[in-house]
Amino acid sequence: MRKGEVLKLGIVPYMEGKEIQLKAFERVKKGETDGILILLQHPPVYTIGVSGGFDENILVPLAELKKKAELYKVERGGKITFHGPGQIVAYPIFNLAKWQKDVHLFVYKLEETIIKLLEEYGIKAGRKPKYTGVWVGDEKICAIGIAVRRWITWHGIAFNVNTDLSYFGLINACGITEFGVTSMQKLGINEDIEKVKEKMVDKFSEVFGIHFSEITLDRLAVIDNAKA
């Protein structure tokens, strides 16, 4: 079985989270581990991926949007989405050479991870033709936006546990106008987010065939500095 590391954090500012991803990326690139799974939450922030759609997917004046949350353009695929407390953001920094060099398969497995996680709570979720992510009926519960460099993945998924969904009302999330968003809480499941994280790690391990050892942020920094 592949060997990886998991880093569980609390609420981390978006740009700080990006720096953590880059440190993890370097560790994976050096072959020190097959993959690092980072789990955290962000303060309220909107991010816009490389597919753009900036003007048509923001439904309020830009100044009003920026009063509600930070706004960044980022390297992942996709259009605009929201991150905030109550949402688990998972950044799998995986070397696909250890699996298959197939980005579509990787995305499929990310979706499968969340579908299996929701099964644990009695929620029937699935995929929707033409769209990425995980859906419950016509509402998206998990968005996916990744980037790949040298067959190593970064960015990842955003899974709504008890997110304040009103933030999504200011945008066309992922550029989608005809469907909405949901969360575990909206579906009647009130679970502690740390418990959901634990189950998510288990499902990542199951779907990707990887055993995780937990590390701390300090440990990651020490490793990064030692190899610099």
Swiss-Prot record:
Alphabetical UniProt keywords: Acyltransferase, Cytoplasm, Transferase
Cross-referenced PANTHER family: LIPOYLTRANSFERASE 2, MITOCHONDRIAL-RELATED (PTHR10993:SF7), OCTANOYLTRANSFERASE (PTHR10993)
EC number(s) reported in the record: 2.3.1.181
Reaction equation(s) it catalyzes: octanoyl-[ACP] + L-lysyl-[protein] = N(6)-octanoyl-L-lysyl-[protein] + holo-[ACP] + H(+)
Name of the protein this chain belongs to: Octanoyltransferase
HAMAP family: LipB (MF_00013)
Pfam family, one: LplA-B_cat
Marked site positions, Lowers pKa of active site Cys: K140
Domain named BPL/LPL catalytic: residues: 31-212
Residue stretches spanning the membrane: none
Binding site for substrate: R76, G77, G78, K79, I80, T81, F82, H83, A143, I144, G145, G156, I157, A158
Record has Acyltransferase as a keyword: yes
Subcellular location: Cytoplasm
Function: Catalyzes the transfer of endogenously produced octanoic acid from octanoyl-acyl-carrier-protein onto the lipoyl domains of lipoate-dependent enzymes. Lipoyl-ACP can also act as a substrate although octanoyl-ACP is likely to be the physiological substrate.
GO biological process entries: protein modification process
Active site (UniProt): C174 (acyl-thioester intermediate)
GO molecular function: lipoyl(octanoyl) transferase activity
